[in-house]
Every structure is written in C-alpha cells, then in structure tokens.
Amino acid sequence: MKQTPIDPKLIDSLVGELGINDFAKATIREVKLVAARAEKQSGVEFIKMEMGIPGLPAAKVGVEAQMKALGNGIANLYPDIQGLPELKNEASRFVKAFIGIDIAPEGCVPVCGSMQGTFASFLTCSQADSKKDTVLFIDPGFPVQKMQLQVMGVKYETFDVYSYRGERLGEKLESYLKQGNICAIVYSNPNNPSWICLNEEELKTIGQLATQYDAIVMEDLAYFAMDFRRDLSKPFLPPYQPTVGRYTDNYILLISGSKAFSYRSEEHTSELQS
C-alpha cells in the first residue's frame, strides 16, 4: 500500500462513524468534519481549502470607508429600495474593469451573501416559464444550492463535467436542454472543489445553447480571477476573467465580495444581471 501522510484506515473509520455512505459525494461540511477529526487524532495538520474563507488582510481603504460610514449613521438606516447608487455604479465599473463586459448599474444587485443571491435567482428562474421547472447543474458545485432547490420544491438535474470537457460538453448539455424543461444552468468558474476552469470555447458552447433553448445561465464567480496562470489583476486591460456573458444575454453573474476582496464585513456579494 502506498505510504500516505494520514493512515487510510483512520479516514475510513471516521467516514463510517459519521455515517457517510459515499465519501466521493460528501458535502463540504462533512469533508471538513472528517478532516478536523483526522487532524486531531493524527496530529498532522491539514491545509483546508474547502470552505473558501478569505483569510488575507482586508484592504485598508475598505476598513476606513466602513468606519466612516458607520460614524455617519448608516447603521440605523435601510438602504434605498432601488439600491445605493454609489455601490451599484461601482459594481458596474468593476465588471467592466475586470470582466470586460457592460452591465448597467440597474442590473447590479447587492445581496446579503451569495447564498441569498442564488436563492432569489432560483425563485425567479423557476417561475419565469411554467413549462421549465428544472435547474441543471454542471457539477461539481456547491451542495447548498441543491438544498435551496429542495426547500423550494424545485426539481434539478446534474452531471459531472469531468468526462465532458471540450467538444463533448455541447452534446451532453443539449441532451438535457432539448427536453424543454430546463430553466437555468448553474456552474462555478473557477470551480470549487475541483479547481478546474471552463475555457472560452466551453463558455461559448454554454452561452449559445442557453440562447437557443431560452435558459438562464447562473455563473458563480465566487473564486473570481483566481486562475493564476494568467494575470487577471489589471483593470480595463486584457486578459479578463472568462465569462459566459460574452456569448449570451441570458445570464446572471454571482460575485462574492468577501472572496474577491478578502472583505467579509456584513456581506458584500453582488448579483449581476444582463
């Protein structure tokens, strides 16, 4: 047996203790719990990447701006129902600077965490057309999103992208879309937990099929610009963060401020709609 840092028997016993039938299908929280117990029992430290916790020091300009806003009494007010113009305008500018596409400020919707953004988006997509009652996930993805659909009573389909990269993706995707019941297509790019990135051709395929079959793409950009094979950090200069938004008008982008800016704060996630 190959030597590993952690005895496989320890992991197997922990998986059994926690009642996990198939570890390959374990949730993020289950994986974290197994890792925490294995770390405690073995004394071997784990590098934990499963929860996507920011961790880097928050930008000074953000901290100072938040303190100033609190000092000016913002904490006792609800924001305008149309959204704070400064935030919506800057969100639009951010998208132009780092994704290279145009989204009007009216289409930039600040939400209390990406989970709230996906919940609201699922509600909208699943009720837009009575004939389209199913959400399609290009996995692996965020298990909580499927739990949200279960709470709503919305059906979903799923397939693992691993075996359908490149040209094979279009055929697989169309096999679902041509049934006529798919209201939305969901994926994350860069992907957590597999850390793969869909390329421009794959995004083009998704976008064109979404237009053809009138489905809405929900592109989760929680790990925004974290494909470090290219420098995506220069505003208003290519290369930009890849997005399906170049290939269809039927899309919603979900950008996590806590991850993109390492600024957890009171939640600064934006939902961006074309």
Language-model-detected regions and their locations in the chain:
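Short glycine-rich anion-binding loops that position phosphate/pyrophosphate groups of nucleotides
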Residues: 54, 189-193, 259
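Generic recognition of short, well-ordered alpha-helical segments
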Residues: 60-61, 197-201, 265
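Residues immediately C-terminal
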Residues: 223-224, 260
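Glycine-rich "substrate-gating" loop/helix at the edge of Rossmann-like oxidoreductase active sites
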Residues: 19-22, 194, 257-259
